[in-house]
Amino acid sequence: RWFWPLGGDIGANGLLHVFVAEMREHSGHYLGHVEPVATWLVSIDPETLEVVEQWAAPDPSADLYGWSVVSHREHTYLYSHCYRQFGWDPFPSSESTVGTHDWDCTADVTVARVPRGRLDVTPEYWNGAQWTNDAGAAVAVIPTEGRAVNPTQVAVVDDRFIAVTKVDDWWGSDIRLDDAPTPFGPWTTYGTMTVEARCAECNTYFASIVPFGASDETFTIAVSNNHWNGDVIEHYRPSVVEVAIPS
């Protein structure tokens, strides 16, 4: 097993809290069939970067609430994604039979909330009409049409929720920019962009929001780069681009 950091935020106690996915390999070789099995929470001193505490998250499930984290006004919002991307189903438009994402869940992003900075308490979940304690009632909140994989990251810019999604992860080429007045929508796609791969054997994946370097009219995202066979290490450096804030 290994642990994969997700989203995080400064808590009410002044510590940086980072959600972490516990990953399990069920096959006999690396990335043959990987499954997230639990969510953990790690508290870090933001000045010394020392780990203060680590424990099972208040929602410790494999739903991975904490995939993306954003605070706004009275609440901190925890977005969820199943993150099943190795050894599941073949990509529909590819001739390869290699198992990749789990198409039963990878388009869905749900959201929960806690009081602002209280990442140590059990969240409540958006069921399409109201917030509820029933995690099983949570509904997808990010647009899914034409998107097999939604590894969405969310931020608040100018009192609006901004969602950045590298559609279809390492199989896709488009990055969708959506904005909404609330953490659950309704979302409007205001932009689509493409960051070119660095070589014929390369791809791009996972667009993340960089919390610095933006102007009054733009914000910054970093796009990860990959080489299909993993040989060309210099291609791994992220591409950083500025994108417009919706008018």
Placement of each model-derived feature along the sequence:
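Glycine-centered flexibility motif
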Residues: S61-G66, E74
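Extracellular glycan/ECM-engagement signal in secreted proteins
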Residues: A207, E217-T218
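Short hydrophobic/aromatic beta-strand or adjacent loop that forms the aromatic wall/cage
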Residues: T204-F206, R237-P238
